[in-house]
Amino acid sequence: MSSSLSWRAGVLALAAVTGSSFAAEPIWDGNRVEMVAENLGPGVIAFYAADARELNAKGGAAATSSGLIVGRRGALLVDTMLNSRLNAQVLALARKATPLPLLYAVNTSAHGDHSYGNMYLPSATRVIQSAATRDYVDAHLADDKAFMLKNFGAGRGIEPIVARTGDVLVPPGGKVLVDLGGRTVEIIDFGFAQTGGDLFVWDGQSKVMWTGNPVIATRPSLPWLLDGHLVETLSTLRKVYAFLPADARVVPGHGVALGREDLRWHIDYLAEVQKQVQAAVDQRLTLEQTVARVTMPEYRGYVLFDWVHPSLNVPAAYKDLNRP
């Protein structure tokens, strides 16, 4: 199953658990979100929802984050948002930050809230994606839109979306260096982190990284093992942690900037899931018995905990650790 198809299944499971329909009541509404900017250093700006800081602090679900990196020649945008409305907001914030052209835009994954806005970019802007993201969007955009409309609601700017895929592709396990003029940005594939096409954007000059969805937000949010691969995901997050200097700042997929040490919460959670599920597998427990045992109440606090932990992450870990 492809990563985005797993994502669909996960959101459907969430709707079942919560007893709600996203079409009527989405986690966040693309018609209502208001984006704001925060300067993280000269030429480095994070864009996130106005209520993101409050939602992150109480374990709520915030809208997609974005950002801008500016060099002497032009700028690079991180993630292009769900629809025309949100894309227009981040482009307006970018124009306030610099009169220089938008040379590049990066999609950290194929998820629509990170990439649907590609079609609204200036024609001269070059889109950077992983090869896996390009292949998925080229083959499955119609299915993806149908899912988004069914579960996130009509009239939220999804209907007009057409594919605009990568001009520059990051190969599996590779990276692309982008020269913005006096500033080189690294677009890195550290390995499987949620979708199999996850890209991390690193500006070494400011020591700021954008992670996309592998890091949803600060504690108490948790990783989503949407396509399984617990062991690989844990390994990738450890690589990211080791890569970052101690004073780095991290802009997550759905929240305000955090520090390097804040990644420990996500790494420690996955490590504990691996430890406890492996013990259950070694004792030949069934999946149902494993879910009942591996409750990990010390990691509660995230509004989606009662779905993401017992219904997604523990079953994904059980499947991964049961492989021959």
Regions found by a protein language model. Give the residues of each.
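Acidic/histidine-rich helix-loop elements
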Residues: F47-A62, A139, R219-L230
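Accessory terminal helices/loops
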Residues: A24-P26, A242-D247, V256-P324
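Active-site metal-binding motif and surrounding structural segment of the metallo-beta-lactamase
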Residues: R72-L76, S84-Q129, L169
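Bacterial N-terminal signal peptides
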Residues: A9-S20
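Conserved beta-strand hairpin/beta-sheet module of binuclear metal-dependent hydrolase folds
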Residues: N39-L93, L199-D203, K207-N213
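Metallo-beta-lactamase
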Residues: A24-R32, E38-N39, G74-L76, L82-S84, T133-E272, ...
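Bacterial N-terminal signal peptides that target proteins for export
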Residues: M1-V11
